[in-house]
Amino acid sequence: MGGVFELFGEGQRFLQFSNLRAGNESDEGNAATKLDLTLATGNNSTLFDNLAGEDRTLQSARSAINLLTFQCFAPGGRIGVAKRNGKETAGKGSSNHAPCTPSSMVHTLMLGQNLLETIHQNLLTRESVTDSYGPNGWGIPAWELPVEKREDKTAVENSTLTHLGRLVPLSRAIRLNDGGFSIILANGLEYPIFPAFREATATVIKRKGELAILSASTNRSLWRQLAAVSVRRQADADATSGPLALNRLRPSAETNIWVGALVTDKAKIEDVVESTYSLPAGMFSEFGRASYERGVAYAEELEGGLIQSVKTYASALKVTSPAYNRARQQFWTRVEQHLSALFDLARNTDLAADLPNCPWGKAVQAAAFDAYDQSCPHQTPRQIEAYALGLRKLTFRPKNQQPTPLAHE
C-alpha cells in the first residue's frame, strides 16, 4: 500500500497511471512544469514566469501538489494520446474539464485555526454523503481499487461516482519520468458533472427555475454571492445549498471560510479568484441571509443608477465612449471598503428595514457619488451642465419592506 504514495519507481504511483507509455517512440513528452498552472506552459501567460524557455526540475513536494491540483482543475481541450497496456488512451486527443473546473464553479472551505482543524471541519459524515450521493456514494480511495483498464466498470465507477474516489481524481493519464522534468500526459477518466454529481465544496443554486452550480466571474466579487454559499443542505428538501461540510457546523459565532474558483473560458484559464470571510452566525439563518442579500441587491441597484447617470452625462456632451467601466470599478472598489457594515445586516436584520439610512446604505450611496464624481469631469461650463443632468439620476428612494427569506431555500 505504501507504494501508491510514491512519485517515482515501478508499479503504482501517486495520482499517476501505471503501464503508461508515450504514443510513439519519438515523443519526448511534456515539460513537468505543465502541471503547475502558475507557470508559463501551453496557453498560460509568460507574464510572471521569465524561465519559461528553460528546462526545469521541480522539487518532489511541489510535484506532488502540482499533480493533485492538475488532476482536480485541469481545463479541457486538446491533449496528447498515450498508450496504456498497449491500447490508446480515451478521447482521441480531446479532454473534458477536470472535476473541479466546470462552470468556473465556486468552491468553499471552512477555515480552522490550523491545518488539522481545517481538514477536520471539511470532513463529511456518512449520513451527509448518503443524503447527497445515495447509499453507494461513500466509496473507497482510488488507490485501494485502482483502474487497471477502462473496461473495469466497478473501479471506474468507484473513482468517478463516489465521494472518496473523487477526492483524488485521475482526470488525466500522467506519468512522471524518473528525473521529474518531463511527463507523459494524456486523457484520463471521465468525471460526471452536475447534475449527475455535485462536488462537496460547490454551491447549488436555482437559476431560471433550474438547479445549477454557482459560478465565479472576474467582474462579480465573491462577497456578492455569500448568501447562496451559506445555505445549509436540508435532507429530503430542496437541493440548493452551499458546501456540504456546512451541515456539520452549528455556528453560534463567527465562521471563517475560504471561497475561490478557477475562472475559465473553454480551454483557457482566465483568472483565479479567492477571498476569505468571517461570516456572522446570522448568515446561517433565513432572515439574516435575506437581509444580507437585500444589502447586495441595494448596491447593485445603485450601480445601475450610477451607469444611467454616466450615460446621461455622456449623452449631453455627445461622448461616444462613456466611462462605464471606470465608474463601475471606482464604485465597487469603494463599496468593498465597507463590507463590515454589510455583514451587520445579517447580525441585526432590523437595519435592512431602512437600507438607505443604515450605515451600509449610506456607504453605498457615498460610493456611487464618488464614482460619478471621479468618472465625469466637471470643469468647463458644458461639463458642469452635463454633470448636473447626470447627478439628478443619482436619487435614492427608500423601499420600506421587511427582509424575507431567500426564494431558493
What is each stretch, according to the model?
Residues 47-49:
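Beta-strand elements of modular eukaryotic interaction domains
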Residues 51-54:
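Flanking scaffold residues of small Cys/His-coordinated metal-binding clusters
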Residues 1-42, 69-409:
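Extended alpha-helical scaffolding segments
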